């Protein structure tokens, strides 16, 4: 099955690239990774299979300066390259940390290209932590509104809800790593359903039927062991703050 379904994960902007690099490091397999950024210095070290420096003439590879409009225009400047890397895919996940310039602005353009190319297009994004400021949150909310119009299914993970599950003494760097881990779980959870045989047979047609033009979706995480593990894990996932 993994050879039959073409799955690609596109990380947009610094947050999206950090997320896909974390996925690669943790061994998410059966997918192709694509990194997109306006900041060449942040793009080049990425572990992604494909890297696209968008808006070269507009930003000279120096980034979007936290301006989503620059991110959007840069993606439009490079739309032929973006279209090429998503064409032929069955499923395209588009991930970003909403609130910055490149991720917020480019993610809707990337998703639009993927959907036009015929892929099931799933957005998986985070909203900023409260300590990142109101401007970043406002940018994120505007970006999510635009993004939601371009994807089949959108999963939004509020970082402030995530932080309520973490140690109050956690460092900012570790908090961002935890956000990357949640993005990994969201994407791996769906891709594994498609590529990994299980006790209940779910094929790509089933997934597509549920997720095509589905709108907003929610995810929860639960873990358990022992005799009632399925019920306990299910209840934990349902009540998960994220």
Show which residues each predicted segment covers:
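Tubulin/FtsZ superfamily GTPase core signature
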Residues: 1-242
């Amino acid at each position: 099955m993994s050879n039959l379904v073409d799955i690609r994960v596109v990380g947009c902007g610094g947050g999206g690239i950090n997320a896909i690099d974390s996925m690669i490091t943790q061994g998410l397999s059966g997918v192709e990774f694509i990194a997109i950024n306006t900041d060449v210095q942040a793009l080049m070290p990425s572990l992604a299979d494909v890297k696209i420096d968008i808006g070269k003439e507009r930003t000279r590879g120096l980034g979007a300066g936290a301006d989503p409009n620059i991110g959007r225009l840069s993606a439009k400047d490079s739309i032929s390259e973006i279209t090429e890397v998503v064409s032929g895919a069955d499923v395209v996940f588009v991930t970003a940390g909403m609130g910055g310039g490149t991720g917020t602005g480019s993610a809707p353009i990337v998703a639009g290209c993927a959907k036009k190319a015929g892929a099931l297009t799933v957005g998986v994004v985070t909203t900023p932590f409260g300590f990142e400021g109101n401007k970043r949150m406002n940018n994120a909310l505007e970006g999510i509104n635009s993004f939601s119009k371009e994807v089949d299914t959108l999963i939004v993970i509020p970082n402030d809800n995530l932080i309520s599950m973490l140690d109050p003494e956690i460092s900012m760097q570790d908090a961002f790593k935890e956000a990357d881990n949640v993005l990994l779980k969201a994407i791996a959870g769906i891709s594994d359903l498609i590529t990994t045989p299980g006790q209940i047979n779910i094929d790509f047609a089933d997934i597509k039927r549920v997720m095509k033009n589905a709108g907003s979706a929610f995810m929860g995480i639960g873990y358990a062991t022992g005799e009632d593990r399925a019920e306990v894990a299910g209840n934990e996932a349902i009540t998960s703050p994220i």
